[in-house]
């Protein structure tokens, strides 16, 4: 149960950077290309879609887990999301449209472990302890979200702010650190 709980913490840590900062990052991407005003609504829509992709991503991750096994699926999703988060900071060097499409792809990948880890946890928990088990599991996930968001923001500030590519690369790299440290 500890491994599944830490895996969930890593999943939330790795997800919050993308989900919480996507609109600001896309604003930066548009500004890098000399745009901004015309992409305004698409930034908000892309941000909303990244959040909504958690549902099908979680379902797909759970289905893969049933077919390939929880360990194999969780590891594959961790590696794919670590790679996606690490490289996503560099997306600002691409066109705004490409960055938005990559945001959707990364948003899907990083949320792929939600359901399979939760169902795996419930499968191994004692029936009379499931409520407490899920409560602790949720609290550690939220702690990962808090720490990940805080460190993401600190990385942005320490490396020059939201108007610098290096700051975004380091901040998205923080998502990788969370996955490696707890996963």
Protein language model features and the residues they cover:
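C-terminal transmembrane helical hairpin of 12-TM major facilitator-type secondary transporters
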Residues: 69-117
């Amino acid at each position: 149960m500890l491994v599944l709980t830490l895996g969930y913490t890593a999943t939330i840590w790795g997800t919050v950077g993308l989900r919480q900062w996507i609109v600001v990052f896309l604003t930066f991407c548009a500004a890098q290309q000399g745009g901004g005003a015309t992409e305004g609504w698409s930034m908000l829509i892309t941000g909303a879609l990244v959040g909504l992709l958690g549902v099908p991503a979680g379902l797909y991750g759970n289905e893969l887990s049933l077919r390939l096994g929880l360990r194999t699926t969780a590891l594959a999703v961790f590696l794919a999301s670590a790679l996606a988060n690490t490289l996503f900071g560099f997306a600002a060097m691409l066109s705004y449209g490409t960055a938005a499409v990559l945001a959707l792809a990364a948003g899907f990948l990083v949320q792929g472990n939600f359901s399979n880890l939760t169902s795996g946890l419930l499968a191994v928990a004692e029936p009379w302890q499931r409520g407490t088990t899920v409560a602790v599991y949720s609290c550690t996930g939220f702690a990962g979200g808090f720490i990940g968001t805080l460190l993401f923001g600190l990385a942005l500030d320490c490396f020059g702010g939201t108007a610098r590519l290096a700051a975004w690369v380091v901040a998205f790299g923080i998502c990788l650190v969370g996955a490696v440290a707890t996963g």
